[in-house]
Amino acid sequence: MQQFRSVLAVLSEDSLAEVAFERALHLAQANEAALTLVDVVDSNPGELARMLTALTGSRGTEIAEDVLAYHRGRLAEFGARARDAGVEVSEAVLQGVPFVEVIRMVLREGHDIVIKGATAAPDGRGVLKGFDMHILRKCPCPVWMLVGPGDGSFDRILAAVDPAPADDAARDRLNRMVLDLAAGMAERDRAELHVAHAWYLPEEHALRHGRYTSGRQEEIDRMVDRERDRAQDRLLRLLAHYPQVPKANSHLLKGNPGDVIADYARARHVDLIVMGTVGRTGLAGFIMGNTAETILRSVTCSVIAVKPEGFETPVTLNGG
């Protein structure tokens, strides 16, 4: 199944660029998709030349062109490898605020997914820094952030879902987007596909220790059981559309979603988490949501963040 027609790979020099390129190339090949490779020089056109002139006293324009030529040459090497692999590829060196220019590229060209290696750390792994988090929060299409040096293929993929009540169609669509994407990735990598839903009884601790309710533990136990049963029913209803997920691979996790999903991913050596993010649908601007933020800042595996329908990026093509 072709899930993507246009893949954008961000190959910043300070990121896990090789990992991102290999994954983007593999994804483009599997989908017969076009591949665009970009790097961003963190200065607006003309600013780099002025800065270099101030530093060197002369020849700032020529030196700036050398800098841009270096970045173009670096992308051209990646591009040549993609062409040798039979992939339709183009390259672009952008100038400006990095996350803004990448998102503007998505808006202009209609890319289906952005792939980026996280900022490289001395130990060879990736860490999520400002550029990475801005793209994850504000890019309108799914963003795949790779954090490990060996992220070329995956053995275990986790779809983190939040099954909706029957009357919440928007949340149901987001969950299905997450599962469709995770299932496609698992099929291509021949990876195990797991699905997790975190649940809890709101204010359970306060109820168990409250002045008026601490003596009613059996009643609180029944409330917890009912909440668990509701969560189980919603998860089963969602997974009825995904027979490829074995019952043993669906997991109800009790606790704060951000914490228990991150803990589960570490304990089970999950390679990739696919998750939805919570936004203010229809508003220009985006709130990632506590669950997604906690997961992103806690996990040591790669993540694909999927936006809800109706999401509007605060970045505009002109001046945003």
Sequence positions of predicted segments:
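Small/aliphatic-rich secondary-structure junction motif
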Residues: 1-58, 156-217, 313
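General small-molecule cofactor/ligand-binding pocket signal
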Residues: 36-38, 90-94, 144, 194-196, ...
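Gly/Ser-rich helix-loop-strand patches that form or flank binding pockets
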Residues: 3-5, 21, 30, 99-153, ...
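Structural beta-alpha unit
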Residues: 1-3, 16, 23, 45, ...
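Charged, low-complexity C-terminal accessory regions
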Residues: 138, 198, 220-275, 280-281, ...
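Hydrophobic alpha-helical membrane-association signature
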Residues: 20, 71-74, 174, 178, ...
